[in-house]
C-alpha cells in the first residue's frame, strides 16, 4: 500500500507476517 509516499508491502507466510 502507498501512503504519503511510503510504500509498504505486507508479506504473510508460514513464518508469520512481516512489513517491509
Curated annotation (Swiss-Prot):
Belongs to the jacalin lectin family. It comes from the Eukaryota. This is Agglutinin beta-4 chain. Tetramer of four alpha chains associated with two or four beta chains. GO terms for molecular function: carbohydrate binding; IgA binding. The keyword Electron transport does not apply. The keyword Electron transport does not apply. It comes from Artocarpus integer (Jack fruit). D-galactose-specific lectin, binds the T-antigen structure Gal-beta1,3-GalNAc (Thomsen-Friedenreich-antigen-specific lectin). Potent and selective stimulant of distinct T- and B-cell functions. Shows a unique ability to specifically recognize IgA-1 from human serum. Keywords: IgA-binding protein, Lectin.
Amino acid at each position: 500500500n502507498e501512503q504519503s509516499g511510503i510504500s509498504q508491502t505486507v508479506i504473510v507466510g508460514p513464518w508469520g507476517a512481516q512489513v517491509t
